[in-house]
């Protein structure tokens, strides 16, 4: 639902159905947005529940991937653990054939961001976090299980502290745009309820998009940061993990549709208690996808995805091979009105 109250004031309410989740039908996003009139310098703002402006793959009123079925590792994680209740403002100035923009926001919620990334690791899928949804965790080590629930609710707010993010954009005179974002949920690391504790999760995200001729577009993102929980001890934090991921995506109009190829790289580095709880991981993935329009409101997708990763805790906690690889071929029909 996208009500347009005036030229300057609009809204969006998005509800999604995802079979097999803790809430099959739930609120996706809901916010009011404002934009100033046409001018060289413009201001816009929004307030409500939404994803921060991180992904270059997602868009539209339902925050879906535009050129494939499965997003990158970077944006799969953003989709499942980085949703906020926020007030966001953006100031943009155009000069000549280029522009600069600064976006800043203060938010609450998203206290549990980092739990999945630490205890499960990276994943590639199209499941998105909704307001009331929770995700199951894999089997935990004996040292962690007494202090962590078997599920995580990433959107919860348990410490009452506000976080922030800020983003800088430059649209160059050439068909190239770049952006840099800093995110910090400012979790206090000790507040909690129902065996879920506020995590301190901070990261940088750098993105770029370029047109390579009339029919080809390249997109890339690099995300790196740290997440930790619990009090500092002489032996380190109970959980303290550095993480990083990147992808390069090339899309070309082909045969009346669009062909996309993407390569992903991702890793985590555990900084504490590795002997008892080794959350190190490294892996990569490759994807080929073809999107073909059937009508002006329906598209069909075919996607081939291969993922390989090495994570020691799979063997230690779940008796699964630490080194895993999967190949998936899937199709999807997407209808929009």
Task: Label each region the model flagged.
Residues 46, 75-83, 134-138, 187, ...:
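Short C-terminal domain-edge/linker segments immediately following a structured domain
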Residues 142-188:
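Loop-centered beta-sheet repeat module
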Residues 26-28, 43, 59, 83-85, ...:
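Residues that flank catalytic or metal-binding motifs in active/ligand-binding sites
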Residues 114-121, 125-159:
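Flexible glycine-rich, low-complexity coil/linker segments exposed to the extracellular/periplasmic environment
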Residues 1-120, 169-176, 249-252, 258-264, ...:
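Outer membrane beta-barrel
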Residues 76-80, 156-158, 196-198:
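Short Gly/Pro-enriched turn/cap motifs at secondary-structure boundaries
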Residues 30-34, 38, 58, 175-337:
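Outer-membrane beta-barrel pore domains
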